[in-house]
Amino acid sequence: YTTLFRFMLPSTEHSEINFDHPDTLETELLIKHIIDLREFKAVQVPIYDFSTDMRKTETFTVEPRNVILVEGILLYVEPELRKLFDVKLFVDADADIRFIRRLHRDLTERGRSTESVIEQYYATVRPMQREFVEPSKRYADVIIPEGGHNVAALDMVTARIELLLK
């Protein structure tokens, strides 16, 4: 996520930011990092603190590899980012499964309340899913149904990755 200094909002207004909109992501930095990794250069990745809605001062190092996996629900929204991927996968999960996963994550990892997660889901998560995520899946080379539990699709993806590693 982009730093909140960009939005110039006091911390009391952070909850008003739609963090599910692509504009809140540091897409340019991700593009730079992927290009660097493809050129076999290590990158320093920022660590985002969801409890403060800010970046931490420390980063972590990602070393280049022959295969780079990049995960995120908004990856295919930006055309320049899409161009960097050799294979584009979209893991399709039912809305109720996505919501349950998000609820569990936000309760256990981010200290959120059930009410705040539900409110955010209706206010921003679901609308952004419909506006950006669902339409962007048409750019995927492979759509994996059943939330990633489709064995046949996973076997095909595994075979493709193994080919890339040879």
Name what the model sees in each region:
Residues 7-56, 67:
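Conserved nucleotide-sensing/catalytic segment adjacent to the nucleotide-binding pocket
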